[in-house]
C-alpha cells in the first residue's frame, strides 16, 4: 500500500505476485533480510500454508485475497475435500470442482455432450429456480434432472450466471495470524 505522510510518500507494504515455493518466497526473504518491508500483500498464488511454514513469524499480519465464497456450500466442500485428503481452501479448487460439476449437469440437462448443448444448459442448471444442489450432491442433481426437475447448482462457490453467461466472482480476504492463513472477510 502506498500512502502519504505529511507531504512525503511512504510505502508500508510490498505487493508480492508470484508462487509460494518459487520466486515469491525469495522476494519476501530478500525484503525481510534487507529490512525493506515487514508486511506483504499476497496474490492468490502466494496463499498457502507452506509459505507460512517456510517464512515463519515474520509473515504475521501479511494479507491477500483469493477466489472463494464464505457460505454453507464452501464449508461443506471444505469438509468433503478434507475427508478425501485434499485442501479444499487452496486457490481455484472450489471453482474447478464447480466447473466440472456444472458441465456434467449441463450434459445431463441437454441429453448431449455437444458443446452447444452444454453452453445452452449451463445457466439452466446453475440458476434459480430449482432444487438446490450443494457439494457432494452431484448424483442427486443428475437424478433430479433425469426426472425432469429443475435444479439450482450452488456448489462450493455459490455459482450464479448473469444474462450474458458470466459468473459473478466471490473472493475471500485472508491474513496470516497465529501461524496460518485465516479468512477475515469477503470481497
Where are these regions (language model features)?
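Extracytosolic ligand-binding ectodomains
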Residues: 1, 7-8, 12-187
